[in-house]
């Protein structure tokens, strides 16, 4: 933006400075109106509600003239400061440290002055030194405007002013500006009021008013000299300006880490300076008012009047004033709070000063200071590190804040979760243990029951031996098979024992050797035997209390697959009390038995099948169920190659019927119809034609002989009759015919037979008694 007098600044800076200028003007106008109103109320002023700038030139033109004047003044200051910039780094550092601590002292002094009754003290002070103040009004014009701007926006403007004012060559001027930036709006009000009182002198009033206008014209240029130093550059585009702002912002973030290592050494230098200036403080006390600001509302003065440069004497005087303020601050208060904040502000001032110097060097074709560049690089690296630390700190702060807000709920939630996990684990363990215990209990119960049944059954099972082995007249094979077997004590009456066993075990001998589980032996007598049922009853006497009577079960309730135990004496006494386990493999089996060992079956035995291991010597042994009750007596097994675990037992209900008759009668009376028969399956073709047997008949028996006056003869059976059904049941062979007839031994009722005679079918009734 061209503002005349060969000055060009970026448009964005121009707009920003214009807004600040107009804002300050409006603020000053409102402030003056307010002060005038108060003066009217106090009868100290004859002016009321005077509107400032109404008759002045256009605001925009006034702003341009003010800005142009400031730029010219700034260029002169920059040229003067070039010579001083060649000083050594050590001098610059010492100047910075002195400025830093002086600035800190001024700020602390200002804080202490706020607690004093400023209205009375400052009014008196201003009256005594009004002449000194008026003599230095040209120097204080710009400073008065800066004070008012800094009071409205203290942090922003203060940092920008200190950016340039903290240069080593201008430390005195920086001290004055920093002192003024620390003053509050209340100080400005009191000073303005005092000046209003002094304005009663007619010969001085017009001059004071003209100086206020000069202050207003220099307000904006003085606010941010660091920005004005760049105005001689070429106009920056908006992206370049934003990039520059970001770099400056990053440099400000690392301000507190740049000069941290040198603060301890600077403190000693500051103390030396303080002791050096202490003697001269009292001599220059009357010159304090030269630093005050003068406010007036006269718009008729020249707006374009530039600020006057400060002399060396003024700079020395400013330094002495600040040393005095530091001394008073230390005397009034021992508080040290704010040191770090002032140090940080000083760091920012020095940082902006270095940036301004580098920018100025670039504009004039000079290389930046090597130390400043190194510091900038160090700042950038430190900035990155600080950003990472700041991010981690932010996360930590968020977590801490979250924990502080919600820690009771989190603790309760964690407790509930832990409680649920513990209860779940407990319940799972309990359930698991219960299941294991149930399984163990079931297994233990099963095991215990099985063992209990086995132990009880062993006490009721005995070994039966006959004297057949001593009889040399019998075949050796027969003697070896019949010489040993097992028996079951099914009844005990006092010392009398009733033992059931197989008929083929006792053989033809009346006396049997009975050996108990405790290896005691007695001689028993055979009460009776029945070869058709293969059962025998032996009576023995023993006072041994260990021999028990076995419990009797019910064979009519047998279930296929029901578990059973077989207790016997396989292979004789040496293996007595052997227990084997199995299940019921089949029910209602008709097993052909050869009693006399002539390789011809003599009888069909009704039995149930088991798969428990049965060996020679188990004949006559006990078959018990899971309750330990007797359900059968072992009778036979199939001994064939490739056949295993196919054994048969007589149902206990049939055994009870047989042993009852054997106890009382010693034998079983079966019906005898008085016939001899042949199986149809064994007839040849000539024999089939002789009896005129139809071709469809495959099974049955042929009557070969009929006894005279026998039951068959009385019933009308004749030789050559073919019987195919008996008692409503198919007749396969003569074994089946005998089994059906013997099954009616108790009732001896007549049964119906279906026969073929001379090729014709007919039925007859066969009498059984």
From Swiss-Prot:
InterPro entries reported for this sequence: Chloro_Bact_Ser_Proteases (IPR051201), PDZ (IPR001478), PDZ_sf (IPR036034), Peptidase_S1_PA (IPR009003), Peptidase_S1_PA_chymotrypsin (IPR043504), Peptidase_S1C (IPR001940)
Stretches assigned to coiled coil: none
CDD domains: cpPDZ_BsHtra-like (cd06781)
Keyword field contains Metal-binding: no
Keywords for this protein: Cell membrane, Hydrolase, Membrane, Protease, Serine protease, Transmembrane, Transmembrane helix
Domain PDZ: residue ranges: 680-733
Record's compositionally biased regions (Basic and acidic residues): 21-64, 71-108, 138-186, 264-296, 310-330, 348-364
Region listing for Disordered, in residue ranges: 1-390
Active-site residues, record numbering mapped to chain: 504, 534, 619
Biased composition (Basic residues): 1-20
Membrane topology value: Single-pass membrane protein
Parts of the chain that traverse the membrane: 410-430
Cellular component, GO annotation: plasma membrane
Gene Ontology MF terms in the entry: serine-type endopeptidase activity
Bias (Polar residues) ranges: 126-137, 247-262, 331-347, 366-390
EC number(s) given by UniProt: 3.4.21.-
UniProt record, GO biological process: proteolysis
Compartment annotation: Cell membrane
Sequence similarity: Belongs to the peptidase S1C family.
Protein name: Serine protease HtrA-like
């Amino acid at each position: 933006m061209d503002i005349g007098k060969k000055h060009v600044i970026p448009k964005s800076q121009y707009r920003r400075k214009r807004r600040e200028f107009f804002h300050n003007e409006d603020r000053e106008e409102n402030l003056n109106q307010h002060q005038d109103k108060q003066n009217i109320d106090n009868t100290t002023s004859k002016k009321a509600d005077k509107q400032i700038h109404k008759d002045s030139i256009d605001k925009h033109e006034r702003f341009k003239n003010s800005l142009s004047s400031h730029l010219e003044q700034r260029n002169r200051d920059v040229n003067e400061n070039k010579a001083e910039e060649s000083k050594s780094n050590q001098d610059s550092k010492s100047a910075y440290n002195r400025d830093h601590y002086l600035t800190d002292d001024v700020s602390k002094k200002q804080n202490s002055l706020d607690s004093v009754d400023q209205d009375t003290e400052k009014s008196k002070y201003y009256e005594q030194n009004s002449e000194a103040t008026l003599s230095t009004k040209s120097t204080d014009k710009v400073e008065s405007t800066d004070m008012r701007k800094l009071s409205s926006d203290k942090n922003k403007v203060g940092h920008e002013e200190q950016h340039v004012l903290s240069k080593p060559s201008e430390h005195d001027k920086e001290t004055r500006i920093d002192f003024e930036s620390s003053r509050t709006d209340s100080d400005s009000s009191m000073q303005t009021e005092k000046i209003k009182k002094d304005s009663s002198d007619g010969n001085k009033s017009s001059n004071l008013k003209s100086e206020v206008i000069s202050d207003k014209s220099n307000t904006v240029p003085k606010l941010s000299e660091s920005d004005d130093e760049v105005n001689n550059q070429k106009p920056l585009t908006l992206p370049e300006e934003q990039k520059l702002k970001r770099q400056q912002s990053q440099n400000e973030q690392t301000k507190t880490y740049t000069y941290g290592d040198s603060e301890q050494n600077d403190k000693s230098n500051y103390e030396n300076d303080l002791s050096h200036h202490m003697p001269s403080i009292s001599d220059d006390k009357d010159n304090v008012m030269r630093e005050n600001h003068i406010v007036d509302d006269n718009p008729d003065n020249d707006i374009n009047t530039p600020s006057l440069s400060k002399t060396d004497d003024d700079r020395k005087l400013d330094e002495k004033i600040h040393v005095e303020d530091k001394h008073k601050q230390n005397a009034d208060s021992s508080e040290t709070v704010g040191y770090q904040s002032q140090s940080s502000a000083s760091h920012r001032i020095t940082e902006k000063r270095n940036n301004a110097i580098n920018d100025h060097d670039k504009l004039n074709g000079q290389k930046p200071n090597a130390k400043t560049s190194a510091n900038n690089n160090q700042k950038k690296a430190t900035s990155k590190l600080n950003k990472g630390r700041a991010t981690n700190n932010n996360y930590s702060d968020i977590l801490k804040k979250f924990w502080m807000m919600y820690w009771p709920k989190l603790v309760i939630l964690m407790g509930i979760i832990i409680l649920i996990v513990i209860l779940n684990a407990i319940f799972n363990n309990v359930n698991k243990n219960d299941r294991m215990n149930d399984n163990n209990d079931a297994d233990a119960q099963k095991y215990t029951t099985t063992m209990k049944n086995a132990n009880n059954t062993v006490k009721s099972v005995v070994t039966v031996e006959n004297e057949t082995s001593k009889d040399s007249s019998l075949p050796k094979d027969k003697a070896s098979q019949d010489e040993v077997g097992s028996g079951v004590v099914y009844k005990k009456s006092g010392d009398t024992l009733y033992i059931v066993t197989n008929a083929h075990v006792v053989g033809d001998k009346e006396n049997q050797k009975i050996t108990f589980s405790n290896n005691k032996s007695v001689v028993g007598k055979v009460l009776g035997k029945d070869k058709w049922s293969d059962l025998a009853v032996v009576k023995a006497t023993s006072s041994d209390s260990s021999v028990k009577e076995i419990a009797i079960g019910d064979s009519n309730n047998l279930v296929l697959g029901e578990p059973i135990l077989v207790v016997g004496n396989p292979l004789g006494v040496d293996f007595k009390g052997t227990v084997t386990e199995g299940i019921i493999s089949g029910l209602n089996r008709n097993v052909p038995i050869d009693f006399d060992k002539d390789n011809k079956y003599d009888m069909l035995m009704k039995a149930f099948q088991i798969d428990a291991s049965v060996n020679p010597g188990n004949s006559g042994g006990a078959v018990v169920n899971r309750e330990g009750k007797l359900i059968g007596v072992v009778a036979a097994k199939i001994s064939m190659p490739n056949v295993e675990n196919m054994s048969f037992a007589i149902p206990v209900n049939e055994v009870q019927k047989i042993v009852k008759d054997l106890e009382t009668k010693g034998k079983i009376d079966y019906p005898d119809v008085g016939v001899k028969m042949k199986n149809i399956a064994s007839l040849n073709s000539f024999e089939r034609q002789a009896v005129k047997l139809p071709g469809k008949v495959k099974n049955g028996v042929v009557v070969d002989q009929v006894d005279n006056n026998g039951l068959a003869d009385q019933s009308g059976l004749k030789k050559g009759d073919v019987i195919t059904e008996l008692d409503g049941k198919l007749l396969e062979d003569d074994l089946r015919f005998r089994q059906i007839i013997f099954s009616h031994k108790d009732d001896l009722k007549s049964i119906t037979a279906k026969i073929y005679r001379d090729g014709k079918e007919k039925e007859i009734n066969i009498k059984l008694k």
